[in-house]
Regions:
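Long C-terminal interaction/binding lobes of large macromolecular proteins
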Residues: 1-179
Length: 179
């Protein structure tokens, strides 16, 4: 009881506007609500201890782990339903909430021949530009329909299943068949 009281007191929460995610919420049902909480000290220590800058697989694994631990979805949804394209954005929102301040990302500006900073947020990052593709979007089914085929973005669940399949197959004797 006391632990829950202190959690409510110190753990920050924030509702994510799914229309500001890279997927723009186009592939989620209208009733989905995503709420994030600030990361725990254990989450941060685990991430920092195991972070390997040059191993993208490890980086993605720990990003997903932190998102899974610090996300609450409306009833009927689970972590695996989140679209893969949204995971990094949600992770950075968790970091921003945890730190209590904006995140500045450093990039190299070729025109100025120097490093520049840009504040992370939906105003500065536009991941999905639909253009003429929007004419194929089915608002009822929340997907694109082209020549009778429905298309949507892969979810974390699909991505994880495919990754696990490839890991298992790569360990088998005939793994060269999958390259």
């Amino acid at each position: 009881m006391i632990v829950e009281f202190f959690k409510k007191l110190f753990v920050r929460k924030k509702k994510i506007d799914i229309k500001l995610l890279p997927s723009q919420g186009l592939f989620y049902k209208e009733d989905l609500v995503i709420t994030i909480t600030s990361a725990s000290k254990n989450d941060i220590e685990d991430y920092e201890k195991n972070y390997i800058r040059d191993d993208i697989g490890v980086v993605i694994y720990y990003i997903k782990k932190i998102v899974e631990r610090n996300i609450t979805l409306s009833k009927g949804y689970k972590y695996e339903d989140i679209k893969s394209i949204d995971i990094i954005f949600i992770f950075l929102e968790i970091v921003k909430l945890t730190k209590g301040r904006p995140i500045n990302l450093v990039y190299f500006d070729k025109n100025k021949d120097k490093d520049e900073k840009i504040e992370f947020g939906s105003k500065n990052f536009n991941y999905l530009r639909l253009g003429n593709l929007i004419e194929y979007y089915d608002y009822k089914h929340r997907c694109f329909v082209v020549d009778g085929y429905k298309y949507t973005l892969p979810s974390i669940g699909v991505e994880n299943c495919l990754t696990n399949f490839l890991i298992i197959k790569s360990a088998e004797e005939d793994s060269g068949d999958y390259n």
